[in-house]
Amino acid sequence: MTASSKTPASSSGPSPHAASAHDKILIVDFGSQVTQLIARRIREEGVYSEIVPFQKAEAAFLEMKPKAVILSGGPASVLDKDAPAAPMSILKAGVPVLGICYGEQTMAQQLGGTVEAGHHREFGRAAIEVTDTCALFEGVWEKGGHYNVWMSHGDRVTKLPDGFRAVAKAQGSPIAVIADDARRFYAMQFHPEVVHTPDGAKLLRNFVRKVAGLTGDWTMRAFREEAIEKIRAQVGKGRVICGLSGGVDSSVAAILIHEAIGEQLTCVFVDHGMLRKDEGKTVVELFRHHYNIPLVHVDASKQFLGELAGVTDPEMKRKTIGRLFIDVFEAEAKKIAALGKGSAEFLAQGTLYPDVIESVSFTGGPSVTIKSHHNVGGLPDRMNMKLVEPLRELFKDEVRALGRELGLPEIFVGRHPFPGPGLAIRCPGEITREKLDILREADAVYIDQIRKAGLYDKIWQAFAVLLPVKTVGVMGDGRTYEYVVGLRAVTSTDGMTADFYAFDATFLGATATSIINEVKGVNRVVYDVTSKPPGTIEWE
């Protein structure tokens, strides 16, 4: 979230410990918004993949020694002056290469083909006709068949480089898929990584298995063992302090670190008063009693709610919560040191791979985009601590898989995403303890109804929102004037886009009745049917 100073250099960029132990695929990023999906699809095949911007691809290739390379899509045109390009050293290295969209165009041009501007952009669903066989299509597409794909391009390949043949075409792309079987170079004008290309995952699997010959040995069990060794090597006999938010990321990180170094870890759980119902009790029970991990539980709700009184701007809410979290966390760390346990040299946090992937700016050079965490941002600088980030190579779904590998209860591992500022951004307008109590109860009833209906695991995220308005109602023989609760539920694969979940009317009616009957202060319930875009998943 926001309240952070810059992330220290020790966390600026991936540093895979899997590099020496497993086969790897290097993904060269040309700025596509869906490059992360390529990495996820490859990892689903049990092969470690890493994304680097094209400017750093040559150095990364030498360091990683990958068994294959994928060139991503991107917004640029190969016809532009100083257009991004793949290092020729990679194209001459003898490893399989797959080009996707812009990756196809730059591969074709760099190897002697011709790319021209199209008469019109081709964006959205398109039909591919397979004109010849190749390793990518084996067992997936047949010669002469027509298949749906997702296109997003303006330029197109019009002349093949030597050694290539066209194996598929589309209406706007006469050369839609190309193959050089001898060099194991393949490229496609469409995006196989997105769900809108139904057979895309199978095509990528063929590149991994049949073209690159990789079997897939990167598992969460292997990651767990390697991460434990890495933590022990980094920490030695030092002490680690970990800020728990109650979410999956920080919890999995803490349990993994505790498995590595035991009592050298102390966790600090700051309850800011904006958690879900019984969340504080659940965290304390899990860490103190189930895992026997040293835990300091701080109820700072009075302090947080006092500072938030009168604050209505959502960004100011985030900044206030982030600033206070740092203050409280730092104070507790000093108390731990004063008790004779010694000052912690290391700060653990649940940074994930999307937080550290370097993005590319084609006008201003490379820029590192690292998500600031509302709960620990700025602490390493202020407290002179080194970072321990055992999850920084993983995507969210991989963190959940690691949690299961570590034995976390499914009801905890499979929880829907929850924002760092908590219910503060699900309560538009000013926050009060009364409003939070109402929202907490309404949310609990809603989630309980979803679980009873067997829908929880089918939904990406579901929650209640307490609207800053009251409406007139009738309950019994009396008039009421109480709050409105909004219900939100979405389906998504990655959180970047989302559709509202289509509950049936019976479920919505029963849930609304339960909330109104069980939660004092609510007399009306509405359902949010906005997708993302144009809306966001959270209301603030």
Curated annotation (Swiss-Prot):
It comes from Nitrobacter hamburgensis (strain DSM 10229 / NCIMB 13809 / X14). Catalyzes the synthesis of GMP from XMP. GO terms for molecular function: ATP binding; GMP synthase activity. This is GMP synthase [glutamine-hydrolyzing]. Gene3D superfamilies: 3.30.300.10, 3.40.50.880, HUPs. Homodimer. Keywords: ATP-binding, Glutamine amidotransferase, GMP biosynthesis, Ligase, Nucleotide-binding, Purine biosynthesis. It holds the Pfam family GATase. GO terms for cellular component: cytosol. ATP binds at residues 245-251. Its EC number is 6.3.5.2. It is an enzyme of class 6 (ligase). Residues 218-415 form the GMPS ATP-PPase domain. Pathway: Purine metabolism; GMP biosynthesis; GMP from XMP (L-Gln route): step 1/1. CDD domains: GATase1_GMP_Synthase (cd01742), GMP_synthase_C (cd01997). It catalyses: XMP + L-glutamine + ATP + H2O = GMP + L-glutamate + AMP + diphosphate + 2 H(+). Residues 24-217 form the Glutamine amidotransferase type-1 domain. Transmembrane segments: none annotated. The active site is at 101 (nucleophile), 191, 193.
